[in-house]
C-alpha cells in the first residue's frame, strides 16, 4: 500500500469519534481501499492464487464428493485432481476482471458511504463492495470462467468423470448442474474473502494512532 494512502487511512480510523471528518481523510480511505482491492485481485490472479491457498481454493461441489470417492477408488485419482485444478485455474484467469469494477465502486463512493464505512462494522468496506459489485462481477466473471473452463478442460473433465461414474454405478446416476455458476460463485467468495483481509489490515495497523502521522497528514 502506498505510504500516503496508508497514513491517511490510519488517521481516518483514528478520527472515528471526532466531530471533524475532513474530505482529505475520506479521500485517503478511498485511495487505500483502491489499493487494498487491487492487492486482493493481484493475489488471486497469480498462478495458484486460488489453488495454492486453502482459504479460497475451489473444491469439488458437495454433490460430487461421493462421485469423487468412487472414482478415486477405481483408479481415477489424477482425473479428479486435474478437474479440481482446472476449476481453480479458471478462477485465476477471471480474477483480473474484478479490478476495474472495484476501482469504479471506489470512485463512486460518496462522502456518506465513507462515513458509514468508518463508523460501521469491521467488515463495512467489504460489505459495501459486495453490495455494489456482486451482480456486475457475476456477469463479468461467468463468461470468462466458462471460456477458461473449456480451455483448461474442466468442462470436458467434468463430463468424463460423470460419464465414468454413471457407467460404474448405473443406479446412482449423478444429476447435472451449472458448473460455470458454481465456479463463478466460489471465485467471488474467495475474492471477497481477500478484500476482507485487506480491510482488516487497514483497520488494525498498529501505527495508526501516532501523533507523528497526524502531523504528516496535516503538514504540521
Regions found by a protein language model. Name each.
Residues 22-86, 91:
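N-terminal Sec/ER secretory leader and immediately downstream segment
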Residues 40, 110, 206:
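Residue-level signature of catalytic and energy-coupling elements of molecular machines
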Residues 30, 131, 174-177, 181, ...:
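Pore-lining and gate-forming transmembrane alpha-helices of multi-pass membrane transport proteins
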